[in-house]
A protein has these predicted regions:
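Di-metal (Zn2+ and/or Mg2+/Mn2+) metal-binding site signature of metallo-dependent hydrolases
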Residues: 1-12
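Alpha-helix N-cap/helix-initiation motif
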Residues: 1, 112-116, 177
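Histidine/acidic-residue-rich, glycine-tolerant segments that coordinate divalent metal ions
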Residues: 6, 19-146, 153-158
Length: 214
């Protein structure tokens, strides 16, 4: 994205168009564009250091866009969906983010594993349960769910008592996004119950689906 912005600035400068402008153009790099490191950024929000998890809404809140009349965003895209060096995408998926914290019971994995409750087993079962939902996602809804484990235990000879997961739930429409999110929640809670663990699930609003109609 930064390279595209710089390229646009250089192109405007080379074309010598500045004399004909009645306003000004701002080449505006926005940090923290992606919703990543969700637990860390939620910590910043809870500490009062930020209000949002991504750069654009935070900058809107801070007034950085107050004197901007029109904004054009550039983003990298798939070569399959664009023709030439640049193009206008028909739509972009919306998404919401989820964090899951599985809580079990620590025990010595070699001496007394039966005394533990394995939170990693709950998390891996949840991953399988999420995967089992994929055939229920309609192709036209473009649903994408891609969880990761951000903490899977502490040391190898202790039954994991805490495991953390983050995931996006993406879809072409808000309805499909909420439907997929409900299935993910069901997988997370069902896996925890099956494993004897508890799970804390937090859902964080992301961005709404975007449909370019002009």
């Amino acid at each position: 994205q930064i390279a595209g912005m710089i390229g646009a600035a250089l192109g405007m400068a080379d074309a010598g168009l500045e004399d004909g402008w009645s306003g000004r153009i701002v080449y505006f790099a926005v940090p923290a564009e992606e919703y990543v490191e969700i637990d860390y950024r939620l910590g910043l929000v809870r500490a009062g250091k930020t209000s949002f998890l991504a750069g654009k809404p935070e900058l809107v809140k801070l007034g950085a866009f107050d004197d901007i009349d029109m904004a054009i965003m550039i983003h990298t895209g798939s070569a399959d969906s664009l023709e030439g060096a640049a193009g206008v995408s028909a739509s972009s998926n919306g998404f919401l983010a989820k964090t899951a914290r599985f809580l079990g019971k620590a025990a010595h994995a070699g001496v007394a594993p039966e005394q533990g409750i394995n939170a990693l087993n709950a998390a891996t079962l949840a991953l399988s349960a999420i995967h089992a939902q994929r055939e229920t996602f309609r192709d036209q809804d473009c649903v994408r769910v891609h969880p990761i484990l951000t903490k899977a235990g502490d040391i190898v000879n202790i039954v994991p008592a805490e495991v953390r997961m983050e995931t996006y739930v993406r879809a072409r429409t808000a309805e499909a996004m909420l439907d997929a999110a409900a299935k993910v929640d069901r997988a997370l809670h069902g896996a925890a119950i099956a494993s004897g663990c508890t799970v804390e699930v937090e859902t964080v609003p992301g961005f709404l689906p975007l449909a370019n109609d002009a």
